From Swiss-Prot:
Belongs to the FPG family. It comes from the Bacteria. It comes from Corynebacterium diphtheriae (strain ATCC 700971 / NCTC 13129 / Biotype gravis). The lineage of its organism: Bacteria, Bacillati, Actinomycetota, Actinomycetes, Mycobacteriales. GO terms for molecular function: 8-oxo-7,8-dihydroguanine DNA N-glycosylase activity; class I DNA-(apurinic or apyrimidinic site) endonuclease activity; damaged DNA binding; zinc ion binding. Its cofactor is Zn(2+). A zinc finger (FPG-type) spans 260-294. GO terms for biological process: base-excision repair. This is Formamidopyrimidine-DNA glycosylase.
Length: 296
């Protein structure tokens, strides 16, 4: 599943094409991509067609478009928008008109930029159909103004409003394993299996260490490493292990060549030379160094 860096790469890639552009046509080509919408395709089309995109936002693994033309305003910007979740394999691709059809295209929109007199298409491609688009209303919360469907999603590590020490204190109150806490999107969002393993390796913390056994200083250091790892991944276009994650131009990221723990089982630890091991963890796997990452 795309994690924070991959979704942020998509957001940044969409911005020069979509920001300030008007959505002139919408075609829904697979019902699962709009499964959360009671009014179906008609509701999605009505909420998007003729609207201008004024901002592209993100929290954790969620994207959203803020749209003009709905009259009411909330939190200082238009009240209505579009929420996007990429699921396991979702892609937001910028295409010229009359591009060859993709077998897993689920939604097609036509976008017009009046300033550049450009017309192109934005496709939602999703092989496994776990992703979705949905109209949304923005609401004010204690953690900022966000789409109503994701008010329970916490700030992420790249959110400029995140207070790292406050988050460290919150995490320390949890008795669960530290990796399980990092994966809880209601505590801190955007972290999945890849970046949890990488930030724990960087901070020399065993993934099954109870969060309450770590000091605020250790947890703050862990979160700082997480920020560094994610920024490094952003610089390299995210992590791609197959063709399911690509940027808006269909290009894969290459952070996978910089991974120290995730997927490195049997390989020498880049820090101490011991073999990285893989263990089952909560219906997935953890990758860590048994020498560098001791249980606290």
């Amino acid at each position: 599943m795309p994690e924070l860096p991959e979704v942020e790469v998509v957001r940044r890639g969409l911005t020069p094409y979509v920001l300030g552009a008007t959505i002139t046509d919408v075609a829904v080509e697979h019902p699962r991509s709009i499964r959360t919408i009671e009014g179906g395709a008609a509701e999605l089309i009505g909420s998007l067609q003729g609207r201008e995109v004024t901002r592209i936002g993100r929290r954790g693994k969620f994207l959203w478009f803020e749209l003009t033309g709905h009259g009411d305003y909330a939190c200082g910007f238009p009240q209505q928008g579009l929420l996007v979740h990429l699921g396991m394999s979702g892609q937001m691709l910028i295409k010229t008109q009359n591009s060859a059809l993709h077998p897993h295209r689920r939604i097609r929109t036509t976008i017009v930029r009046s300033d550049a007199q450009e017309c192109f298409e934005l496709w939602f491609v999703d092989q496994r159909t776990f992703g979705y688009w949905a109209p949304t209303t923005f609401v004010e919360t204690a953690h900022g103004c966000v789409p109503e469907q994701i008010t329970h999603i916490a700030r992420d590590l790249l959110d400029p409003q995140l207070k790292r020490e406050n988050l460290a204190r919150l995490i320390r109150k949890k008795n669960s394993e530290i990796k399980r806490v990092l994966l809880n999107q209601e505590i801190v969002s955007g972290i999945g299996n890849i970046y949890a393993d990488e930030m724990l390796w960087a901070a020399r913390i065993h993934p099954q260490t109870p969060a309450s056994h770590l000091s605020v200083a250790q947890l703050s250091n862990l979160l700082e490493h997480g920020q560094r790892v994610m920024n490094a991944a952003l610089d390299q276009g995210g992590t791609s292990f197959d063709s399911l994650y690509v940027n808006v131009n269909g290009q894969s990221g290459y952070f996978d060549v910089s991974l120290h723990a995730y997927g490195q089982q049997g390989q020498a630890c880049d820090r101490c030379g011991s073999n990285i091991i893989r263990e089952k963890f909560a219906n997935r796997s953890s990758h860590f160094c048994p020498r560098c990452q001791l249980m606290h």
